[in-house]
């Protein structure tokens, strides 16, 4: 079994760019940014429970990494960068720390490196279970209306929230709930030590208005790019800013 993905081919000899979306996104999420880099072959992945991979279920990050590895092999992708936002960034960091043959580097936008104590994990588990129950049982428009009121999305205005609620409500609530629980921060290990000892290039992007993740970025041994005029979802709020950072990283 492999993950559903869309491919766009570039020039031979350059590494692939493998894009991983955030929770409730899909393979289209990164394309406004990714299609600027047409010299590179691009793979836009649907993570388990999302988009064309909605029917794929996992028990945890190990399963996601295994599926990602098999997907890369199936497309004969031998050299690549992982580019991930939020959940996709966490998947990218986890997979990279577990080891992926051919990995050139990891570019993470607003991805959490992991909670650091049992109390934080217990609280996050309670919260994610409550959200998962709502995703399973309530209309998605109502759930996402509340989801985007969370502090991490404070930089969004009302129009941006309405647009995101409408977009994300096309998902399957049950499969979102399953993926939320399987990849909760409560079950993700703290990756700070692994990232400090890494053997791959590591870049971190965060929005200027995303105070939580700017603080987290300062804790990581990564080259950090702060995206101006953007909050947590920087590639949506300021795609040009993210494109500029990726171009600098890739020496485009």
Curated annotation (Swiss-Prot):
The keyword Iron does not apply. PANTHER family: 2-SUCCINYL-5-ENOLPYRUVYL-6-HYDROXY-3-CYCLOHEXENE-1-CARBOXYLATE SYNTHASE (PTHR42916), PROTEIN PHYLLO, CHLOROPLASTIC (PTHR42916:SF1). Monomer. The keyword Magnesium does not apply. One of its GO terms (molecular function) is 2-succinyl-6-hydroxy-2,4-cyclohexadiene-1-carboxylate synthase activity. It is an enzyme of class 4 (lyase). Belongs to the AB hydrolase superfamily. MenH family. InterPro entries: AB_hydrolase_1, AB_hydrolase_fold, SHCHC_synthase_MenH. Keywords: Lyase, Menaquinone biosynthesis. This is 2-succinyl-6-hydroxy-2,4-cyclohexadiene-1-carboxylate synthase. Its EC number is 4.2.99.20. Catalyzes a proton abstraction reaction that results in 2,5-elimination of pyruvate from 2-succinyl-5-enolpyruvyl-6-hydroxy-3-cyclohexene-1-carboxylate (SEPHCHC) and the formation of 2-succinyl-6-hydroxy-2,4-cyclohexadiene-1-carboxylate (SHCHC). Pathway: Quinol/quinone metabolism; 1,4-dihydroxy-2-naphthoate biosynthesis; 1,4-dihydroxy-2-naphthoate from chorismate: step 3/7; Quinol/quinone metabolism; menaquinone biosynthesis. It holds the Pfam family Abhydrolase_6. GO terms for biological process: menaquinone biosynthetic process. NCBIfam families: menH_SHCHC (TIGR03695), PRK11126.1 (NF008340). It catalyses: 5-enolpyruvoyl-6-hydroxy-2-succinyl-cyclohex-3-ene-1-carboxylate = (1R,6R)-6-hydroxy-2-succinyl-cyclohexa-2,4-diene-1-carboxylate + pyruvate.
